[in-house]
Amino acid sequence: MAPKKAKRRAAAEGGSSNVFSMFDQTQIQEFKEAFTVIDQNRDGIIDKEDLRDTFAAMGRLNVKNEELDAMMKEASGPINFTVFLTMFGEKLKGADPEDVITGAFKVLDPEGKGTIKKQFLEELLTTQCDRFSQEEIKNMWAAFPPDVGGNVDYKNICYVITHGDAKDQE
């Protein structure tokens, strides 16, 4: 009986290890940090309330239950870290890196304006995950100055991240 259990466990581990082989250790660590930010109650599972709290932390209050339910239905069950990583792995297969990065910024832009408030982006970059230093923030604003309203064009940032040079602004 023990060999059967070992085989089942090995098969289960092999199934989940495939998703871990899709990413390098740095990427897995970044996904883990993102998971931890979203898992607001720190129970190891992302649920609807975690999503609601995450949206509230980003300034988006009154998210509709239907929207949260649709997000939760993308997973086949409870969203632990392995499921979270698998979901991103499936979404990123064959995806254009610029589209992926733009999509990440769009989550922070619920009105779809193509901009994010400088203050909000700076707060995220200096308090979450791989934190920016004050010098890195200064360099970023020099490269991507906000408009007079304090908004940052994230599409230009995405272009530079993926192509290495600013778009012609003509």
UniProtKB/Swiss-Prot annotation:
Which terms are listed as keywords in the entry?
Calcium, Metal-binding, Methylation, Motor protein, Muscle protein, Myosin, Phosphoprotein, Repeat
Q: Which domain of life is it from?
A: Eukaryota
Q: Name one Pfam family in it.
A: EF-hand_6
Reproduce the UniProt comment on modification after translation.
N,N,N-trimethylalanine found in this myosin light chain would not have been detected in the N-terminal tryptic peptide in PubMed:863872 and PubMed:352892 because it would remain trimethylated and ninhydrin negative after hydrolysis.
Q: Which GO terms describe its molecular function?
A: calcium ion binding
Which GO BP terms, alphabetically?
Answer: skeletal muscle tissue development
Q: Does the keyword Phosphoprotein apply?
A: yes
Q: Which SMART domains match?
A: EFh
> Which amino acid positions bind Ca(2+), per UniProt?
D39, N41, D43, D50
Q: Which residue positions does N,N,N-trimethylalanine occur at?
A: A2
Q: Does the keyword Repeat apply?
A: yes
Location of the EF-hand domain: 26-61, 96-131, 132-167
InterPro entries found in the cross-reference section = EF-hand-dom_pair, EF_Hand_1_Ca_BS, EF_hand_dom, Myosin_RLC
Q: Name one GO cellular component term.
A: myosin complex
Residues with the Phosphoserine modification: S16, S17, S76
Q: Which residues carry this modification: Phosphothreonine?
A: T26, T36, T102
Known function: Myosin regulatory subunit that plays an essential role to maintain muscle integrity during early development. Plays a role in muscle contraction.
Further information in the entry reads: This chain binds one calcium ion.
Assembly and binders: Myosin is a hexamer of 2 heavy chains and 4 light chains.
The protein in question is named Myosin regulatory light chain 11
Q: What species is this protein from?
A: Oryctolagus cuniculus (Rabbit)
Q: Which lineage?
A: Eukaryota, Metazoa, Chordata, Craniata, Vertebrata
